Amino acid sequence: MNKTLSYLIIIFLSLTVMNACSLKKMAMNKVADMLASPGSGTVFTGDNDPELVGDALPFTIKMYESLMVSMPWHLGLKLQTGSLYIMYANAFIQAPADMLAQEEIEKQKYLFNRAKNLYLRGRDILLKALDHKYPGFLNRLAKKEFDRALAPMKKVDVPLLYWAAAGWLGAFAIDPFDMKLGMTVPGAAALMNRVLQLDPGFDGGAVHDFYTLYYGAMPDYMGGDFTKARDHFKKAIEASGGKITSPYLSLATTVAVKEQNLEEYEELLNKVLAVDPDADPSNRLLNTINRRKAE
């Protein structure tokens, strides 16, 4: 009788612990689902105060990352964490560094190194998320079997592909003399090309804005092509209805500068200034930052 009672107590305690663990897992899943929901990012992207967002993002990113470590199966959390690293590197580290005066070259180098590190950190999180969903993806990518690696991808995978490629190429753009990284750039280009195939209108034409910058900035021997840059610029403006200002800056700072076309350069910057940041609430932060760059 005592032995039977002991067994029952052990079973009861085991079930209690299991239920507690299950409840904790369910609660964490709900929190993660909420944080990773498509609309959650507008808390940041819809803000009109870049300094406020810039101060808040580091804590937010590390909070997301700590949850991600506890929940390695949650792809939405990985997408948010990886993309936030890349957004932060671009908007709050690289962008201020780009605007530093010549005499602050050492500070600029330091900030560029930080941005590169965070670009790659975000990229790696996103690539691992894709490998988790499609086992063998990273191995095929490393072997340059791009078609085989990307064939299973669907439209739902576009955000992971886009941000991984953006972080990858952002890091290379900051440090084009990193030959080891440069050797891997075709993989990033393959990811972005797959985005173009699956969802050319993604995020208001973000992929076309990317290609405006890519074809406009790259040297000829790496695929630079001003005609293609202008073609993607038109498609980016069409996709966004002219409410997102990044394409104007992308064309101005690459093609217009390289062609020494001052008239076009000034015209494009004036178009940035003419867009009301409130016209597209979901991109208010981006348009506010771009407005500062153009002033």
Model regions and ranges:
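Bacterial N-terminal signal peptides that target proteins for export
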Residues: 1-8
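Alpha-helical transmembrane segments
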Residues: 11-15
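C-terminal motif of bacterial Sec signal peptides marking the signal peptidase cleavage site
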Residues: 17-20
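Bacterial signal peptide processing site
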Residues: 22-25
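Short coil/linker segments at helix-helix boundaries
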Residues: 33-66, 70-71, 84-197, 206-239, ...
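Short helix-capping/linker turns of helical repeat alpha-solenoids
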Residues: 73, 203, 243-244
